[in-house]
């Protein structure tokens, strides 16, 4: 074994800002932050529902706060952005073949968005 020190290239914390691909990746992954807030709000709401009508009314008042509404809109936008990037990558990662031919990427992406719309409508009708 050699006593030489291996070469370790210096990297700053912001190395990813210089590369558009990595910047896009970091923005995409950062969309989880507003979703964490949204998930915590839902869990607190579920706990409030169990505690009784007074706690539920208090949670509803909290959710009506304009800052909370704005954060929920940011969470929705982040979720839609994350879904769009996932849907656009899916045909590249797992091409779908029917009758020996690969389906067009646009068809696969539109089918996924159609499924999202159908499930959303179904949930809205049920609830």
Swiss-Prot record:
<feature type="transmembrane region" description="Helical">
    <location>
        <begin position="107"/>
        <end position="127"/>
    </location>
</feature>
<dbReference type="InterPro" id="IPR034804">
    <property type="entry name" value="SQR/QFR_C/D"/>
</dbReference>
<keyword id="KW-0812">Transmembrane</keyword>
<comment type="similarity">
    <text>Belongs to the FrdC family.</text>
</comment>
<dbReference type="GO" id="GO:0005886">
    <property type="term" value="C:plasma membrane"/>
</dbReference>
<keyword id="KW-1133">Transmembrane helix</keyword>
<feature type="transmembrane region" description="Helical">
    <location>
        <begin position="67"/>
        <end position="87"/>
    </location>
</feature>
<dbReference type="InterPro" id="IPR003510">
    <property type="entry name" value="Fumarate_red_C"/>
</dbReference>
<dbReference type="GO" id="GO:0045283">
    <property type="term" value="C:fumarate reductase complex"/>
</dbReference>
<protein>
    <recommendedName>
        <fullName>Fumarate reductase subunit C</fullName>
    </recommendedName>
</protein>
<keyword id="KW-0997">Cell inner membrane</keyword>
<dbReference type="GO" id="GO:0000104">
    <property type="term" value="F:succinate dehydrogenase activity"/>
</dbReference>
<keyword id="KW-0472">Membrane</keyword>
<comment type="function">
    <text>Anchors the catalytic components of the fumarate reductase complex to the cell membrane, binds quinones.</text>
</comment>
<dbReference type="Pfam" id="PF02300">
    <property type="entry name" value="Fumarate_red_C"/>
</dbReference>
<feature type="transmembrane region" description="Helical">
    <location>
        <begin position="30"/>
        <end position="50"/>
    </location>
</feature>
<comment type="subunit">
    <text>Part of an enzyme complex containing four subunits: a flavoprotein (FrdA), an iron-sulfur protein (FrdB), and two hydrophobic anchor proteins (FrdC and FrdD).</text>
</comment>
<keyword id="KW-1003">Cell membrane</keyword>
